Amino acid sequence: MYQELLTIKGDSYCLAKEDITCISDNWALPTSYLEFVQELGFGRLLELFLTYIPMGKDNNYCDSLERRNAYWKDVFQQYIQVPLSMLKKKENLELLMNAEPFMFSENGEVVFWDVRYPKAGEYPIYLVHFPVGIYFVGYHFREFITRLTCEETYKSILKFHESPLLPTFEPLSVNQMTSLS
């Protein structure tokens, strides 16, 4: 499914296990993201975003979805304490307070789900670029990819990019560590 949408650069995949479908007791991972990480796994998406895979509770992988989600939730809490102008809007503050981060860009943007509004096994996807703003990207992971690679839609999300992102995926190896240092 996703291999038809993306050009794959490499062939050594680190895939998510099919039996791990959540990283929290409160919400399940969206179907479209599970399909992606079970098909393509951990790597660099669109030459910019690092995709993380669920590896199970108490795993020793710093690049697991569980560990990265916890790390970015802590970072978000620190930003909430800072008087950023982008957080003066009540909607943005509430989005950040309820965010479930799942991807990070090499430019510093963080992609997250708003799990308060599930629909058909999916959650709205947002991209936050501190201190610039929070941008709605789509309702499922395939839409996330297509909106950022489309000439007509990428600029409404990636304000400082001059062209749409390339539809690529580069598989990467997951590092086993006990900290995020």
Which ranges hold each PLM region?
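A surface-exposed partner-binding patch
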Residues: M1-E109, Q176-S181
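Short, charged/polar low-complexity linear motifs in solvent-exposed/disordered segments
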Residues: L48, P54-M55, C62, F130, ...
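Generic structural signal for residues positioned in beta-strands
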Residues: P101, V111-F112, P124-Y126
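Acidic surface patches and DE-rich sequence motifs
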Residues: S105, P118, H129-F130
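Compact, glycine/acidic-enriched structural inserts
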Residues: P124-S156
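Acidic, proline/glycine-rich low-complexity IDRs
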Residues: T146-S181
